[in-house]
Amino acid sequence: MSLVIIGINHKTATVDLREKVAFSPDRIHDAMKSLASRTRTGEAVIVSTCNRTELYCNNAEKEDIIEWLEDYHGLDHNDLMPCIYAYEEQVAVKHLMRVASGLDSLVLGEPQILGQVKQAFVKAKEAGTIALTIDRLFQNTFSVAKKVRTDTEIGAAAVSVAFAAVSMAKHIFSSLSTTKVLLIGAGETIELVAKHLKDNGVASMVVANRTIERAQAMCEEFNATAITLEQIPDFLPKADIVISSTASPLPILGKGMVEKALKQRRHQPMLLVDIAVPRDIEAEVGELDDAFLYTVDDLHSIIEQNMASRKEAAEQAELITEDQSHIFMEWIRSLESVDSIREYRSQSLAIKDELVERALNKLSQGSDSEQVILELANRLTNRLIHSPTQALTSASRQGDLNTLGQLRSALGLDKN
């Protein structure tokens, strides 16, 4: 086997180059077929995300795969080579396991990459570029990634502002199934917050934005209600949680507006998380008895603590991937022994069939049966021990005691 991984990622290449080597979804099927034609067993998988492009091939030469990548995208060899990494055999196996486990990600331990690797595997199956070795490699990798998630705390701590905001809400309210959330803004961060809230089964969401159309587009995906910023005073009293992230140069929520809303809520507590810079919520809101205001700085301190926790978990995860990559390579070596055993058995059976046919012919011609059987036994013995005898003789003549010992052990000569 010659398992090869060729790739570039956020650590080795700029976004400009990563864009040039990326594979669009509509071309990935044909690309994998083309790549597989450069391997001896037709096995290839392409993982292409915003942060990495990696080519996984079995029974291939890395030089051929790099040449294919250059030809496919029309890239200059000198531009690509400084950014390329190439791994083979066990190092390649461990790399894939690390990638799927989030150990090689921009955000340590992020879970999205596992889904992206799984999607690439499914696409390769659809393209017909999966066979025994690559199939087993990816299936094992998915199991390893799951083991890393369950046996370590690598995914337990929030390391993004959006995730940290929702984690704080979960910590304060314990369950989000009965809470109502007001999201202010409709940008990428708020969209990610909405996704995390939906995943955690929040009761309802309202999205307020300066342009109602942008809020409506986001609300369709998350089954939320869209409102304008001017409508916030009407919806604020119903909100248990407020999370805000706009690009407004001035605060969206003032102390007076929040104080009025709290009175209407009969002083039920309200969590407000301001992840905007400059701030969307006046700092004085935090002075109100029933308002619990947190800023982006509060979240960053949580994220820093959690990142340290993830790094500790990553050390455990590295041991898991190291161990599991060795186990996979043992399976690969066992395949090689299976092929050798099959060839040896086939060779021996061919000798047997040849000599039995000769013996039967002699018997049909009236030869003495006892003599025919003795001749068959002698010929069969000589043919079967010919190769081992030559190997023993050669090792002896060369003084190769190590090989001689292995041969004696394999032939059972050292048994008492």
UniProtKB/Swiss-Prot annotation:
Function as written in the Swiss-Prot or TrEMBL entry: Catalyzes the NADPH-dependent reduction of glutamyl-tRNA(Glu) to glutamate 1-semialdehyde (GSA).
Natural source organism: Shewanella frigidimarina (strain NCIMB 400)
Q: Name one GO molecular function term.
A: NADP binding
User: Regarding domains, what does the record say?
Assistant: Possesses an unusual extended V-shaped dimeric structure with each monomer consisting of three distinct domains arranged along a curved 'spinal' alpha-helix. The N-terminal catalytic domain specifically recognizes the glutamate moiety of the substrate. The second domain is the NADPH-binding domain, and the third C-terminal domain is responsible for dimerization.
Involved pathway(s): Porphyrin-containing compound metabolism; protoporphyrin-IX biosynthesis; 5-aminolevulinate from L-glutamyl-tRNA(Glu): step 1/2
Q: Does the keyword Iron apply?
A: no
Q: Which gene encodes it?
A: hemA
Task: Recite the UniProt keywords alphabetically.
Answer: NADP, Oxidoreductase, Porphyrin biosynthesis
Which residues does this entry assign to the site Important for activity?
95
- Locate the residues binding substrate: 49-52, 105, 110-112, 116
Per the UniProt entry, the signal peptide is none
Miscellaneous note, as given in the UniProt record, is:
During catalysis, the active site Cys acts as a nucleophile attacking the alpha-carbonyl group of tRNA-bound glutamate with the formation of a thioester intermediate between enzyme and glutamate, and the concomitant release of tRNA(Glu). The thioester intermediate is finally reduced by direct hydride transfer from NADPH, to form the product GSA.
Q: Which residues bind NADP(+)?
A: 185-190
Q: Which reaction does it catalyse?
A: (S)-4-amino-5-oxopentanoate + tRNA(Glu) + NADP(+) = L-glutamyl-tRNA(Glu) + NADPH + H(+)
What CDD domains would the database entry show?
NAD_bind_Glutamyl_tRNA_reduct
Q: What domain of life does the UniProt record list for this protein's source?
A: Bacteria
Protein name, please?
A: Glutamyl-tRNA reductase
State the InterPro entries in the record: 4pyrrol_synth_GluRdtase, 4pyrrol_synth_GluRdtase_dimer, 4pyrrol_synth_GluRdtase_N, GluRdtase_CS, GluRdtase_dimer_dom_sf, GluRdtase_N_sf, NAD(P)-bd_dom_sf, Shikm_DH/Glu-tRNA_Rdtase
Catalytic site: 50 (nucleophile)
